[in-house]
């Protein structure tokens, strides 16, 4: 319940907020709910526990990341800068 063909999981909002925003919410939620690559073991087994907290189902590594994705664009830049300084 709460799903539609056009907007998937954002169907819970019904006709509210407009189609464009509901499609954007559905896209973000789809990316968030898929499995991501673990930075420790490299397996595609990272799931979101709560806002900004991610855990690997394989090795059990828990780490902080973005609210909707484990690695944010700003985090990638920061990692690249610190790696180049070292």
From Swiss-Prot:
InterPro entries: Ribosomal_eL37/eL43, Ribosomal_eL43, Ribosomal_protein_eL43, Ribosomal_zn-bd. One of its GO terms (biological process) is translation. GO terms for molecular function: large ribosomal subunit rRNA binding; structural constituent of ribosome; zinc ion binding. Its cofactor is Zn(2+). GO terms for cellular component: ribonucleoprotein complex; ribosome. It holds the Pfam family Ribosomal_L37ae. Belongs to the eukaryotic ribosomal protein eL43 family. This is Large ribosomal subunit protein eL43. The keyword Nucleotide-binding does not apply. The keyword Repeat does not apply. Binds 1 zinc ion per subunit. PANTHER family: 60S RIBOSOMAL PROTEIN L37A, LARGE RIBOSOMAL SUBUNIT PROTEIN EL43. Keywords: Metal-binding, Ribonucleoprotein, Ribosomal protein, RNA-binding, Zinc, Zinc-finger. The gene is rpl37ae. A zinc finger (C4-type) spans 38-59. Disulfide bonds: none annotated. It comes from the Archaea.
């Amino acid at each position: 319940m709460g799903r539609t063909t056009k907007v998937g999981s954002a169907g819970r909002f019904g006709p509210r907020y407009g189609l464009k925003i509901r499609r954007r919410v559905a896209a973000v939620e789809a990316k968030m709910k898929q499995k991501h690559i673990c930075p420790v073991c490299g397996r595609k087994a990272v799931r979101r526990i709560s806002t900004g907290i991610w855990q690997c189902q394989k090795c059990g590594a828990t780490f902080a990341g973005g609210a909707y994705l484990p690695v944010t664009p700003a985090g990638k830049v920061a990692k690249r800068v610190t790696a180049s300084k070292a």
